[in-house]
């Protein structure tokens, strides 16, 4: 399943989202969801402990000036890869 997180991690129940995930799932951080991937944050630790692949939309990182503060453990992608993720997963859930 592809999960997308577009809200700030302080404005949603990130632990609940992660409890729904399983190995092989992907999570894409976009819009304010990219805040969850800030280096050194507690939210990042939650993400890294989940059995999923993590991605973030480059345009949203750049729009928020976060490129230099973002974890290198999350793959930064463009819109073409976003489309590939949607094609890969039949089911999607937005948070």
Curated annotation (Swiss-Prot):
Keyword Cytoplasm: yes
Compartments where found: Cytoplasm
Pfam families named among the record's database cross-references: DsrH
Keyword Cytoplasm: yes
BP terms from Gene Ontology: tRNA wobble position uridine thiolation
Keywords: Cytoplasm, tRNA processing
GO cellular component terms given for this protein: sulfurtransferase complex
Task performed by this protein: Part of a sulfur-relay system required for 2-thiolation of 5-methylaminomethyl-2-thiouridine (mnm(5)s(2)U) at tRNA wobble positions.
Family per record: Belongs to the DsrH/TusB family.
Self-association and partners: Heterohexamer, formed by a dimer of trimers. The hexameric TusBCD complex contains 2 copies each of TusB, TusC and TusD. The TusBCD complex interacts with TusE.
Name the UniProt record assigns to this protein: Protein TusB
Gene name per UniProt: tusB
